[in-house]
């Protein structure tokens, strides 16, 4: 049976993931080059703004559950399943990496929804579902870009 502690762990994993993605998306926004520069530069900015919103919402939910959100880069990097960007990726590699990262997060969010549901925490489950829904659309659009 899942508990509030399990839900906080799930949410903190996502706080870590989104903080690493926030930095990675800035990296991509600054270092993207090539014929798709204008499109991707703008899209990466949209994505990092979205990431910032998720970070705040997830951290505040953890606080509402009387937990402690992760709050240092060291903690984020140790906990995240997302890797940092290198500043050396091509535009296509950046997009493919985001497809991979978002796909991995979709799976983690599904698992997190189950944990929250078992703990009777419909609010956290709903929050994770909303992020999941958005990421499925992002994966579809980014994958279409790569074709």
Curated annotation (Swiss-Prot):
EC numbers on record: 1.16.-.-
Compartment(s): Cytoplasm
Annotated keywords: Cytoplasm, Iron, Iron storage, Metal-binding, Oxidoreductase
Reactions listed under catalytic activity: 2 Fe(2+) + H2O2 + 2 H(+) = 2 Fe(3+) + 2 H2O
Recorded GO MF terms: ferric iron binding; oxidoreductase activity, acting on metal ions
A cellular component annotation (GO) from this entry: cytoplasm
GO annotation, biological process: intracellular iron ion homeostasis
CDD domains for the chain: DPS
Binding site for Fe cation 1: 29, 56, 60
Highest taxon of source: Bacteria
Pfam families on file: Ferritin
Entry binding sites for Fe cation 2: 60
SUPFAM superfamilies: Ferritin-like
Self-association state and partner proteins as the record states: The 12 subunits form a hollow sphere into which the mineral iron core of up to 500 Fe(3+) can be deposited. Homododecamer.
Job of this protein: Protects DNA from oxidative damage by sequestering intracellular Fe(2+) ion and storing it in the form of Fe(3+) oxyhydroxide mineral. One hydrogen peroxide oxidizes two Fe(2+) ions, which prevents hydroxyl radical production by the Fenton Fe(2+) ion. It is capable of binding and sequestering Fe(2+) ion. Does not bind DNA.
Similarity remark: Belongs to the Dps family.
Domain notes per entry: 12 di-nuclear ferroxidase centers are located at the interfaces between subunits related by 2-fold symmetry axes.
Name of the protein described by the UniProt record: DNA protection during starvation protein 1
């Amino acid at each position: 049976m899942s508990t509030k502690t399990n839900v906080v762990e799930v949410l903190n994993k996502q706080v870590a993931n989104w903080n690493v993605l926030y930095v990675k998306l800035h990296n991509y926004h600054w270092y993207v080059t090539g014929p798709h520069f204008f499109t991707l530069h703008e899209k990466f900015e949209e994505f990092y703004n979205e990431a910032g919103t998720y970070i705040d919402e997830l951290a505040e939910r953890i606080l509402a559950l009387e937990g402690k959100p992760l709050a240092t880069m060291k903690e984020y990097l140790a906990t995240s399943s997302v890797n940092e960007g290198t500043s050396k990726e091509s535009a296509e590699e950046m997009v493919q990496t985001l497809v991979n990262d978002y796909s991995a997060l979709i799976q983690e969010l599904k698992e997190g929804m189950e944990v929250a549901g078992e703990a009777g925490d419909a609010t956290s489950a709903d929050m994770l579902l909303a992020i999941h829904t958005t990421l499925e659309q992002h994966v579809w659009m980014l994958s279409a870009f790569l074709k």
